[in-house]
Amino acid sequence: MSIEELSTEIDVFLLAEEDKVAKLPKGAIIVSDPVLQYYESLAPGEEPKQIFVANASESLRCVYPLINGSLKIESLYDTGSQIVSISEEKAMEAGLSWDSDIVIYMQSANKGVENSLGLARNVAFLFGDIVLYMQVHVIRNPAYDLLLGSPFDTLTESCVRTTKDGNKTITIHDPNTHQRAVVPSVATVWFGP
C-alpha cells in the first residue's frame, strides 16, 4: 500500500463476539486506523514514508496586552468565543468601569447559564505600539483573566501563523493608524471551569 492509498474513509466494525485478549465486549465498535494499516502493510525492510498526524491536544495560547494603561493581563486567545471578556477581579485591578445595564447570558462549557456583570466600553489594549479599543464584557469568576474572542480578530483583521511545534504569532492591524504588529503568543495550561 502506498501512502497515497491511505483511506480517507473510516472503516467501522461491530465485534460479533467478545475479544478476551483485547478485553472488548461483544458488540463493541472497532474503528480502523489508516496510518496503522499503512505501517502494517509495509514489506519487511521497506522504509516507511513519514506521515504527519495531529497531536491529541495542543496548549491554549495567551498574549499579554497592557489594559487601560495600567495592568498587563494574561489574555487567552480564543477565536471560538463571540466576545471579549474579563474577570471582575482583573477589571477592578485595571480600574475599569462598566455599564451594568448591558448584560448578556452565556452558556459555559459545562452547559450552565450565567449572566455577565456588564460591559466596559472602549477599553484600551496596548500591543507594542498599537492601541486598540475593545468592548469588554465583565464576568464573575471565569476560568481565565481575560479572553480575546472574535471581536479582537475582526477589529484587527488578524492573521495567525501556527508552526508544527504549536507556536503561534498573531499579525494585527490597527484600523486607526494602519500600523501592523506581530504579537507572539505563549503556551498556557488551562484547567477549565
What do these predicted ranges mean?
Residues 72-75, 82-84:
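Conserved tryptophan-centered aromatic signature that marks the ligand-binding surface of SH3
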Residues 75-77, 146:
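Short conserved micro-motifs on helix faces and helix-strand junctions that flank
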Residues 4, 9-70, 104-119, 147:
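Pepsin-like aspartyl protease folds
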Residues 11, 32, 82-89, 95-193:
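Aspartic protease core domain of the pepsin/retropepsin superfamily
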Residues 77, 94-95:
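Short phosphate/oxyanion-binding micro-motifs
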